[in-house]
Swiss-Prot record:
The lineage of its organism: Bacteria, Pseudomonadati, Pseudomonadota, Betaproteobacteria, Burkholderiales. Belongs to the complex I 30 kDa subunit family. Keywords: Cell inner membrane, Cell membrane, Membrane, NAD, Quinone, Translocase, Transport, Ubiquinone. SUPFAM superfamilies: Nqo5-like. Its main location: membrane. The gene is nuoC. Disulfide bonds: none annotated. GO terms for cellular component: plasma membrane. NCBIfam families: NuoC_fam, PRK06074.1-1. Its EC number is 7.1.1.-. This is NADH-quinone oxidoreductase subunit C. It is found in: Cell inner membrane. PANTHER family: NADH DEHYDROGENASE [UBIQUINONE] IRON-SULFUR PROTEIN 3, MITOCHONDRIAL (PTHR10884:SF14), NADH DEHYDROGENASE UBIQUINONE IRON-SULFUR PROTEIN 3 (PTHR10884). It comes from Burkholderia multivorans (strain ATCC 17616 / 249).
Amino acid sequence: MASKIETLKANLEAALGARVVSLTEAIGELTLVVKASDYLDVATTLRDDPKLRFEQLIDLCGVDYQTYGDGAYDGPRFAAVTHLLSVTNNWRLRLRVFAPDDDLPIVPSLVDIWNSANWYEREAFDLYGIVFEGHPDLRRILTDYGFIGHPFRKDFPVSGYVEMRYDPEEKRVVYQPVTIEPREITPRVIREDRYGGLKH
């Protein structure tokens, strides 16, 4: 008798065929990778196929692979990773799609398939700059509307570009260039034989 994950894998391969770029198992969960051009079609099949029935999108996030594997990674930079749940069959699936263009990452929106994707896609847009084509209201959700850049990208500076402060003369919040100076932090080594001024 096949295990639940083997049954799911067989059902996915039968339903999706050549649209599967890769299907891997790790830590008891399957990860399905598809092309951006097949993303909506695959998502609809995952939801509607009677042998799959992924009724719920439970999470969606962006990923920046710029420094993945200590810089040895040589694939597309940005991906949207979706976690799906089938309540009917009691199984989960991770669905990954890579944006074909690193300079302007665009993937289709899943809002018309699972409306729970709405705010998740807005968050991935806000933090990574991934554009979800067809999203009904793609605007920032966590950062300020005037925020410059996307703070979860690997090339975004830790200190940011600007800082905000309240200006009592103007009686409003103003932006100004970051005043934090870059510094190198060197850890202080405390030797056991001189710890706390005690000599052993």
